[in-house]
């Protein structure tokens, strides 16, 4: 495999190599469960998302950590390093039963925390991401170049004109057109969790939905 297909960190995890395409899992851990398998966004304490990712990968459980390039310093000058774009966050594709079992019985998964939302009747519910929305989010968030940026979720509500991209490498992806700080973006927002944007999509490559 080519060198550019891997990233490393200068932290204590620098001895590990992680493939960029690890969210494309073929096999998932099989456990007895009658619950639906969903994409759960999980908070992870103390920037341990890559350690959790490594453990999930070893079990064959699909997961996704959004990554981007950031500048780091070295004795030879600054260089680009691929790092988590949103710290303390990992998306896990599993049933609630499997995730809870891992958290209860495997010490390495204790740092994971479910995220919740308030339902219409005021009750707390576990937050999960619909498959279609997660697929679109991963298609965009897995691209590491200057055309993709991650936004503060406080600046990126879902209010905006909902559209679908009709051509190009992101054909079929759905999102909203939103102006943020005088700039117009094509935005994919996971409420209260994450937001990724394409900085430019030609108007003739968009259709309303």
Predicted features, each with a name:
Residues 161-163:
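Generic structural signal for buried aliphatic residues
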Residues 2, 6-8, 13, 23-159, ...:
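Acidic-enriched and Gly/Ser
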Residues 157, 166-173:
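Short coil-to-beta-strand transition motifs
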